[in-house]
Amino acid sequence: MKKLKLHGFNNLTKSLSFCIYDICYAKTTEERDGYIAYIDELYNANRLTEILSETCSIIGANILNIARQDYEPQGASVTILVSEEPVDPKLIDKTEHPGPLPETVVAHLDKSHICVHTYPESHPEGGLCTFRADIEVSTCGVISPLKALNYLIHQLESDIVTIDYRVRGFTRDINGMKHFIDHEINSIQNFMSDDMKALYDMVDVNVYQENIFHTKMLLKEFDLKHYMFHTKPEDLTDSERQEITAALWKEMREIYYGRNMPAV
């Protein structure tokens, strides 16, 4: 896309929001309570603040304010308001490609915010536990928050990811013509690294004329031991392993497709 010469400030709002899910099977009530306590502590407000603050540091944003809160019985939220340092729009890369990983990211946010909320929960009887982190990065100006996508997903490893990206508003060039998007994008997947894309099955649902993009990701490899909390698969009978595997896979597909499915 040809670089635009703007009249005044870039007034486009670019919002990236995504949910990440971690799935676990806890055999007993004690194990379920233990998983919820473990994941709640792992992603408490202080830890989330560190992740988001590091994100701001890596992308070159100034932190204006931090609001954080842990909740009872579980859950946490953090919101960070940021502003950008002076940046020459001519230096901004607007091509479609994966954002760099944490050690190499350099970018700027403008009049923006980054927020995260966590939602641990468990099935009352079935032994299934899920942890959801809801993250939003919203920017005004020349930078797309998609550049932070690689870093954040790598920081929060997950079984399922749903991502939404939208560009709202318009900005004018020096001739007064409106522009409703200022960078190339055909798919959110084009902003992910090859190693990440190799790990997940993905599907896109995009509304190009509305500048709305949606990608769903489901982890390809399924290893039961990674989903058990304090119980080893080898300590279970074959029928128990099959039953738990079926329950976990059903849970993951329901979350991925966003609908309840009949038992097989």
Swiss-Prot record:
Its EC number is 4.1.1.50. The modification Pyruvic acid (Ser) is found at S112. It catalyses: S-adenosyl-L-methionine + H(+) = S-adenosyl 3-(methylsulfanyl)propylamine + CO2. Binds 1 pyruvoyl group covalently per subunit. Keywords: Autocatalytic cleavage, Decarboxylase, Lyase, Polyamine biosynthesis, Pyruvate, S-adenosyl-L-methionine, Schiff base, Spermidine biosynthesis, Zymogen. Is synthesized initially as an inactive proenzyme. Formation of the active enzyme involves a self-maturation process in which the active site pyruvoyl group is generated from an internal serine residue via an autocatalytic post-translational modification. Two non-identical subunits are generated from the proenzyme in this reaction, and the pyruvate is formed at the N-terminus of the alpha chain, which is derived from the carboxyl end of the proenzyme. One of its GO terms (biological process) is spermidine biosynthetic process. Pathway: Amine and polyamine biosynthesis; S-adenosylmethioninamine biosynthesis; S-adenosylmethioninamine from S-adenosyl-L-methionine: step 1/1. The record marks K111, S112 as: Cleavage (non-hydrolytic). Its cofactor is pyruvate. One of its GO terms (molecular function) is adenosylmethionine decarboxylase activity. The active site is at S112, H117, C140. One of its GO terms (cellular component) is cytosol. It comes from the Bacteria. It is an enzyme of class 4 (lyase). Heterooctamer of four alpha and four beta chains arranged as a tetramer of alpha/beta heterodimers. Belongs to the prokaryotic AdoMetDC family. Type 2 subfamily. Catalyzes the decarboxylation of S-adenosylmethionine to S-adenosylmethioninamine (dcAdoMet), the propylamine donor required for the synthesis of the polyamines spermine and spermidine from the diamine putrescine. This is S-adenosylmethionine decarboxylase proenzyme. The lineage of its organism: Bacteria, Pseudomonadati, Pseudomonadota, Gammaproteobacteria, Enterobacterales.
